[in-house]
């Protein structure tokens, strides 16, 4: 049994403009070098762009996109015998949301058409993810496929 103290759960404040905790988490994720004003500007403009494109509430679109991209299993490497094997592990909701947000940003950064700003690429990736398409959805499906392929190894305890 470990004697190390458990880390405290981070409590995020709600975003001042949209009054939403998920938007605040996304802003903190996109922020670089402590420049939160720029991160807010990018997120707010992409939310306005989403609203113009879909004619719907952008918060609902973002929540739908994050829930579509959120995985429920993760692959962890574990050394068994002399070889390293990939073991699927169920993950909690916080970890799933963190992975979903990370994958959305990676997909928008890697998106072709670098001539468009990050705002356009991010908003299009969020709209695609809310419709069940896009690179982030492919990443989630790939993770689930790997977990399905390695489900015979679940008998070993990872944690």
Curated annotation (Swiss-Prot):
An example Gene Ontology biological process: translation
Official protein name in the record: Small ribosomal subunit protein uS7c
The UniProt entry lists the main location of this chain as plastid
Q: Which NCBIfam families match?
A: rpsG_bact
* HAMAP family reported in the protein's UniProt record: Ribosomal_uS7_B
Q: Which InterPro entries match?
A: Ribosomal_uS7, Ribosomal_uS7_bac/org-type, Ribosomal_uS7_dom, Ribosomal_uS7_dom_sf
Indicate the quaternary assembly: Part of the 30S ribosomal subunit.
* Keywords noted in UniProt: Chloroplast, Plastid, Ribonucleoprotein, Ribosomal protein, RNA-binding, rRNA-binding
Of the GO CC terms on this record, one is:
small ribosomal subunit
Entry GO MF terms: rRNA binding; structural constituent of ribosome
User: Which Gene3D superfamilies is this protein grouped with?
Assistant: Ribosomal protein S7 domain (1.10.455.10)
Task performed by this protein: One of the primary rRNA binding proteins, it binds directly to 16S rRNA where it nucleates assembly of the head domain of the 30S subunit.
Q: Does the keyword Ribonucleoprotein apply?
A: yes
State its location(s).
Plastid, Chloroplast
Tell me any Pfam family this protein matches: Ribosomal_S7
The domain of life is Eukaryota
Indicate the family of this protein: Belongs to the universal ribosomal protein uS7 family.
Q: Which organism is this protein's natural source?
A: Bigelowiella natans (Pedinomonas minutissima)
């Amino acid at each position: 049994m470990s004697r190390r103290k458990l880390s405290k759960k981070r409590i995020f404040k709600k975003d001042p403009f949209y009054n939403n905790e998920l938007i605040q988490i996304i802003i903190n994720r996109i922020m670089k070098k402590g420049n939160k004003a720029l991160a807010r500007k990018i997120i707010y403009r992409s939310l306005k762009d989403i609203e113009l494109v879909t004619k719907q509430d952008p918060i609902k679109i973002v929540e739908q996109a994050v829930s579509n991209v959120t995985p429920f299993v993760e692959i962890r490497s574990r050394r068994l015998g002399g070889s390293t094997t990939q073991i699927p592990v169920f993950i909690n909701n916080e970890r799933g949301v963190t992975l979903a947000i990370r994958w959305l940003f990676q997909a928008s950064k890697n998106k072709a058409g670098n001539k468009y700003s990050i705002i356009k690429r991010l908003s299009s990736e969020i709209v695609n993810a809310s419709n069940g398409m896009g690179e982030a959805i492919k990443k989630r499906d790939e993770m689930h496929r790997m977990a399905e392929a390695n489900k015979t190894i679940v008998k070993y305890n990872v944690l």
